[in-house]
Each structure stands twice: as C-alpha cells, then as structure tokens.
C-alpha cells in the first residue's frame, strides 16, 4: 500500500449518496429508478452504453433492486433494500463529465418523487489516483 501523501492527481471522481425513507408511490420501484437514472444521464449529456435493473423478490436476496446505467466514462448505479427504505446511489466518471452534476440531477428527481426522503450522506472520492503529471487529463 502506498502513502496517500505522495498522490497528487486523479483521473476520476466517484459520488456516493445514501438515503433513508425511500418509498416512492410507484408500482415497480426498480423500473422507476432505472428510468430516473437514464433520464438524468441523458439530461447531463453523458453517453449511455447499457442499462439494466434486477429486482430481488426476497427469496435469495433481501427484497429490493440493483440498477445500473453503464456510461462511456464508467457508471451510475442504485441499490435498494425496499423493506428498510434504504437507497444507495453512486455516480462514477473518469472523463470530462462531473459526477456531481449527475448526483445533483438524480437527487432533485428523487426528492420530487419521494415524500420524506432523507439524504444521510453525500461523499465525493477521487479515483484513479496517481502522481504522474503527464498522465493527468483533468
């Protein structure tokens, strides 16, 4: 493991959002959130590569879903424990787009669609850390 004090640059950022009280009044939460993620990606003018949602019925995994939108710069995902009202979102980009913009758009849509939704944590982490100035593209 290296000493982080030597790392000066990064080539990507990862935004994490953690919510409670995620209980939108929709029939299929997984389909709804996947549509919300895809719309947010499009509004931020990020290129979508693939999208998928897997709904968990509680038999092998706790009830909820995992949704992913692969983008040309990495991904945007959502994971939900529906019985607990927990929702985790992450947006990771390693190109010209700012994942904070994606997170802001997603957050606004979630708040508009989910009464009592509460953001518990928002964290931004630099990714692809390096100390080679010649490799920095940001």
Residue map of PLM features:
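Polybasic/polar functional segments that serve as interface/processing modules
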Residues: 1-138
């Amino acid at each position: 493991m290296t000493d982080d004090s030597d790392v000066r640059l990064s080539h990507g950022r990862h935004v994490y959002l953690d919510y409670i009280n995620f209980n939108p009044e929709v029939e299929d939460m997984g389909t709804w959130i996947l549509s919300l993620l895809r719309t947010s990606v499009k509004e931020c003018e990020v290129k979508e590569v693939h999208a998928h949602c897997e709904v968990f019925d509680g038999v092998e995994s706790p009830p909820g879903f995992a949704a992913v939108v692969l983008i040309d710069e990495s991904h945007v995902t959502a994971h939900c424990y529906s019985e607990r009202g927990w929702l985790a979102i992450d947006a990771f980009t390693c190109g010209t787009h700012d994942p904070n913009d994606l997170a802001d758009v997603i957050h606004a849509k979630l708040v508009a669609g989910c009464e009592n939704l509460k953001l518990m944590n928002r964290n931004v982490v630099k990714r692809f850390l390096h100390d080679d100035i010649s490799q920095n593209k940001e």
